[in-house]
Amino acid sequence: MPELPEIEVLKRSLNRNIKLTKINKIKINNPNLRYKVPLSLNNTLKGQIIKNVSRISKYLIFNIKNEKKLLIHLGMSGTIHIIKKNKQNNTNGSFYNSRNLPKKHNHIVIDLNKNFKLIYNDPRRFGYIKLLNNNFINEKPFNRLGPEPFKSNFNFFYIKKYI
């Protein structure tokens, strides 16, 4: 299972590579993940710009220019691969740096401009992808999460208050 530091590194890698890229097409190869992938994903996000990628706990949140948000949770075995389209047989730009990405478990393929492709690969299918509304932070599971360890208010005094 990817742990919080891995998710943070992945978020930074995504921001470095795909920030301000346009979503050309989303191909859903298998919608049957932990929760069914909304089949409307392509129609909703096609042509939209990814403003940036943020992280809350182990959830990756793709902030889209039209104020939509795409949530990705990697589950137990999920990985995201950033691939330059003209270098598919070479090392890809993902955190995992796999040379040969097994196509069998590529459940979601997001075709981006700037010659990038984003692949969600998950052999166990425990991860999930969903669209969020703007008020998502007040809904489950976000309203039950603990403090963010990388925020400045998570310090000795915060911990002392709860001991």
Put a short name on every predicted segment:
Residues M1-L70, L74, I83-N92, V109-F116, ...:
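Extended, highly charged segments
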Residues N66-I163:
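Phosphate/anion-contacting hairpin/loop surfaces
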